Amino acid sequence: MGETEILAVDDPSAGLEIRRRRVPGYPINLGPVPHLAEERTRLHGLSWEHFDARMLGSTVGAELSGIDLARALPEPAIREVQLALDSYKVVFFRDQDMTAEQHLGFARRFGELEVHPFFPSNEMQPELVKFTKGVDTGGYENQWHHDVTWRERPSRSTILRALEVPDVGGDTLFADMCAAYDGLPEDLRVEAEGLTAIHSFERAFGRQVPPERMEEVRALYPEVSHPVVCTHERTGRRYLYVNRIFVDRIAGRTRAESL
């Protein structure tokens, strides 16, 4: 193995000076990098009329306060929430006292809702999926993914409402795929720009489909292709659109070659 160079790049917004340290390990660079520092500075400079925002990560995640989602919010407030979501990629609202119907009402302000074909829903609110996790329940969500990329038109966003959470653990993690794209070496970025990924429901949900119904379900939800690098429709930023759960392979390559 080679040596690892841990590098902290000069970041005026954080008051850091350049420092280098070599330790035995993998040949990678770690630490604040210029494209993250620039985006973080931009996000910290944003201001909002209908709520306050507190950044939670360097370039992803913000807590929005001073807004009641159970109310019928005016359209300018909804547009500003959408703009905040576009900017921070994920937003959090604490201590919201909402019913299931209010949850759905808020979600409908942002577009058409869908019913998940594999997760169980309820008759009263079929657009809602209830997740229950505990010592007696298993799961397979502990892999990075974007929801329902196996659809021809994947969901734009997901709205989670926590009803009961543990004191420790149970975390949901989020990654900034714009920052991931910006941080690619130039040769990998050029290669990724020309690739298309094949997405399939079968990698995650195939075992839930009875064998006698598999062909029927495949006809309803056939494999779809999406670019590995996409452009956000409102911000214009480029981002990586691949994940280990739903991407079966890269077009023109075998699954083994795609890893």
Which residue ranges define each predicted feature?
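Non-heme Fe(II) oxygenase catalytic core, chiefly the N-lobe of the double-stranded beta-helix
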Residues: 2-259
